[in-house]
A protein has these predicted regions:
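Charge/polar-rich, low-complexity and marginally structured segments
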Residues: 55-181
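A positional/architectural concept
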Residues: 1-57
Length: 181
């Protein structure tokens, strides 16, 4: 029996969902959770109860945890490109290693692993713009994905409309930066 109940809000892989139902003997004699994605109206997901492990299904973070995560953004590390360079002697190989690092962090489904992706892409983009170049397609893809995942979960955790989450993030991060000075 799952530790979740109908009506619970959970994160399943890359989706914030409500547990809509427990379907007993739904497929091949297994019990399944029916999940309704909150930000993708027509998406329903079915997860075998015995496969609903903490690796891919977890409760939504609490409001306290969400605020603590936002407050930690100022001091959060970026992905250390210099540590990746010995294995990536060319710019193309470095881009590939960065993509692998982004993928590795996304696979954890942990909100605290999304922040370094976003901070790294932001720093890389600033450097590129300063040298007359644009954001890479890979960086844009992973930034948008990480931002979407984080904002979806924060919207529910903080009970804030999805479209206002970025404003809440920016305001709170600026406040945290001001306190550091």
């Amino acid at each position: 029996m799952p530790c979740t109940q109908c009506g619970d809000t959970v994160v399943y892989r890359h989706h914030v969902c409500e547990v809509a139902a427990l379907r007993e003997n739904y497929f091949e004699g297994k019990d399944y959770l029916e999940l309704r994605a909150l930000f993708e109206n027509s998406l329903k997901l079915f997860v075998a109860v015995d496969e609903a492990t903490p690796d891919n299904l977890r409760p939504i973070m609490s409001k306290r945890a969400a605020l603590a995560l936002i407050d930690s953004i100022v001091d959060a590390d970026t992905i250390d490109e210099n540590a990746l360079k010995p294995d990536a002697p060319t710019p193309t190989l470095l881009e590939r290693r960065m993509k692998e690092e982004y993928d590795k962090r996304l696979r954890t489904f942990a909100p605290e692993d999304l922040v370094p992706i976003m901070k790294s892409v932001h720093e890389r983009t600033v450097r590129r713009v300063d040298s007359g170049r644009r954001i890479t397609a890979t960086d844009k893809k992973y930034f948008d994905l990480a931002e979407g995942l984080l904002c979806d979960e924060l919207a529910v955790s903080l009970a804030v409309p999805r479209e206002n989450v970025k404003d809440v993030l920016v305001e709170r991060v600026k406040r945290a930066e001001a306190l550091r000075r």
